[in-house]
Amino acid sequence: FYTLSLHDALPIYISGSVFYVLLYDYSYLGGAHPNTVYFAWNYDLDSGMFLTISELAADPQTFTLAVADMIEVQAEEQIASTPELEGRSLSDVYWDNYRETLEKWSSDYAASFDADGLTVIFSAYELASYANGPQEFHFPYAALDSYWSDSGRAVLGLD
């Protein structure tokens, strides 16, 4: 058998000083199927620092839980609109500890900002089986408006 590993990074700028890099690591090690893992980094060129929710949110805990709630709602909508999953609930599709996983979106998973808002990607196996693939959620800045700190608004160019 053979193995294959590919790495790809996509830098996308959102302003003159802030950009994010989305990296996906694809590997096939001879098993039943390959695996792809997503990573994201948000970087402020002016400060020379990686951006985290702690720097961007007025109350990081409240923001993190609010986005977890929003992910849950969007996930339910995605399941309801997928014909193969008709009649299934979140607990039928996702692992038993899905809520715990959702609440760690900002620290353990690929969360990135682009010109339109926040995107959170959970790689295959993080929320559900390989057959369900990566789970991706997007939230426009307007939906998150009440959670940003003043400095977060400035860094993201939301003023």
Please annotate each region the language model reported.
Residues 4-159:
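Compositionally biased intrinsically disordered regions enriched in Thr/Gly
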